[in-house]
C-alpha cells in the first residue's frame, strides 16, 4: 500500500467512497474496492435499507443535535454562542447526508452518488475546520459574536468544504489529472488536514483550561471525547471486518464509529457549556419559573408596603387623577 491509497482502508471498512476509488474491475469495468465484510441489508415496507444499525444511530444523532442546538440558543450571553452553534449546524448537515448515503437512499453506482459522497467529504472537512476556528474563540483574540468572528468561521469552513468537495469529485470523475487510482490529494484533505485541525483544537483547549481556568473538570470532557473518538476510528479502520464476521453481518465498524463520533461531538458541547458563563440578567433558562415566589408575605409585612390597606389595594399608588384640557372634558 502506497501513501494515499485506500486499498487497505476499504478492505477493512465499508466506507461510501470505497465504491468510487480503486482500479477498474477486469470483468465489469467498474471501479471500486469491495470490503471483506459489510453489514447486511434489511427490508422494511418493501424498501431495502443499507447499514440499518448505523442509519438508526444517525437518526438518534439528529435528535441529540437538535437538543444541543436548543440549549445553545437559550444561552444568549454565553461566549462563542454563535460560533459553536455553526459547528453543530454543520454536524447536522453531515449527519443528514451520511444518513442518505448509508441508508441507500442514493444507491451506489447511481449517477448522483459521487456528488453526494463528495458533499459528505466536504462537510467533514468543514466540520473539522469549524472546530479549529472555535478553538480560537476562548482566547479572545477578537470579540466573539461580531461579524468578524462569525464570518471568519463561515468563510474558512466554506473554503474547506469547497476544496474537499472539488478534490473528491475530480478524483471520482477522473478530471483534472486525478483519478480513482490517484487518491493522494483526497487522502491528504480528508485525513491529514482534518487530523491537524482536531489536534490543534485539542492543544488550544488544553492551554485555555490550564492557563485561564481554576477548575480542571473540563479536562475530563476533553479526555473522554478524545478517547471515544480514537476508539471509533480504531474500530472502523482496524476491526470493522472482524466485528462484522463475528456478529453474522448484522453490524460492522461503521455502527460503532457513528456512536463514538456522536459521543465526541456531545463532549465538545459539554466542554463549551461548562467553561462558558452568561449574564443571568439577560439569559433565558431552560427550567421554567426560575424566580418563582415560594411563599406569600406575612400580613404585617404586606401592610407595611407602599400600598395601604384601604378599600382599594391600589389607593396608595403613585397614580393620581388629573384633569385633561382636551376638548374641555375631564379624564
UniProtKB/Swiss-Prot annotation:
It is found in: Endoplasmic reticulum membrane. GO terms for cellular component: endoplasmic reticulum membrane. Its main location: endoplasmic reticulum. It is a multi-pass membrane protein. Keywords: Cell wall biogenesis/degradation, Endoplasmic reticulum, Membrane, Protein transport, Transmembrane, Transmembrane helix, Transport. The chain crosses the membrane at residues 52-72, 84-104, 122-142, 150-170, 184-204, 219-239, 249-269. One of its GO terms (biological process) is protein transport. PANTHER family: CHITIN SYNTHASE EXPORT CHAPERONE (PTHR35329:SF2). This is Chitin synthase export chaperone. It comes from Aspergillus oryzae (strain ATCC 42149 / RIB 40). The lineage of its organism: Eukaryota, Fungi, Dikarya, Ascomycota, Pezizomycotina.
